[in-house]
């Protein structure tokens, strides 16, 4: 089977080709219809990402090279794409640690994060001998088994119960929940998972610096259908393997860029 990815480069935001790409995306964004401003929950996602990146920086030296340029092959065509990594540690010349940060109230966001990291590992393995991956999950209301039981007892219960985190972990044997950074599995085939609460983020960033005023109207507005597991992506993508939809686990910049890119041209690089 032909490789799905090729010609990767690990770059920073000053890369000339990447800057030209972003300019193209922002021009496309200007031509799109006006969109609603981000909700507090979406803003919190970006704030939580910044807080956890700062937390990681107290333990590791984070690299500015956290953008991956690569070709994705589909049949006889190849499309240039870009993928932003939330945090990168270049501990050795041929070793890299990649962190994916998610703030979500849906357990299924873990499945998407794991798939994104699996693809990232496949791409970066062409550059590095060892690629370790970790998900930092901020739980903003993932239902417990008791929550699901109460929900399904209601008259207007959904037709399908939302999965709990334990249920999702049960179908992802290569995702291991770790109690701390030091307790992570060193096996590069394993995706490690560290779970954080909203209170943990408040302790890191301070409640006054976070958007925490989530009301029922906002929660209802974000109750959208789950996207397909492997959606067809646009020709150019800021992050790939993610559907170009609004979700509570998107940070505002990435969501805006993905929305702007949804009408991009296709073609060979």
Predicted regions, residues:
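OB-fold/S1-family RNA-binding modules
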Residues: 229-269
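Intrinsically disordered, low-complexity Ser/Thr/Pro/Gly-rich regulatory segments
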Residues: 1-228
């Amino acid at each position: 089977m032909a490789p799905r990815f090729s010609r990767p480069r690990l770059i920073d935001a000053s890369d000339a080709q990447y800057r030209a790409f972003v300019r193209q995306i922002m021009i496309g964004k200007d031509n799109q219809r006006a969109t609603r401003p981000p909700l507090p929950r979406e803003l919190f996602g970006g704030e939580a990402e910044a807080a956890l990146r700062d937390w990681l920086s107290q333990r590791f030296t984070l690299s500015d090279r956290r953008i991956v340029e690569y070709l994705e092959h589909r049949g006889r065509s190849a499309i240039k794409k870009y993928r932003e990594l939330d945090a990168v540690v270049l501990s050795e010349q041929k070793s890299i640690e990649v962190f994916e940060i998610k703030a979500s109230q849906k357990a299924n966001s873990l499945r998407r994060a794991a798939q994104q990291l699996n693809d990232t590992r496949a791409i970066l393995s062409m550059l590095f001998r060892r690629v370790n991956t970790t998900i930092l999950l901020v739980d903003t209301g993932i239902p417990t088994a008791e929550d699901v039981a109460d929900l399904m007892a209601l008259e207007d219960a959904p037709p399908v119960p939302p999965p709990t985190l334990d249920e999702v972990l049960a179908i992802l044997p290569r995702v291991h929940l770790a109690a701390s950074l030091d307790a992570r599995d060193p096996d590069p085939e394993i995706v490690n998972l560290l779970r954080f609460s909203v209170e943990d983020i408040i302790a890191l960033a301070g409640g006054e610096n976070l958007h925490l005023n989530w009301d029922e109207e906002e929660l209802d507005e974000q109750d959208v259908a789950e996207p397909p597991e492997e959606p067809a992506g646009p020709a150019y993508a800021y992050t790939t393997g993610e559907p170009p939809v609004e979700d509570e686990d998107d940070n505002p910049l990435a969501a805006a860029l993905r929305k702007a890119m949804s009408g991009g041209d296709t073609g060979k690089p």
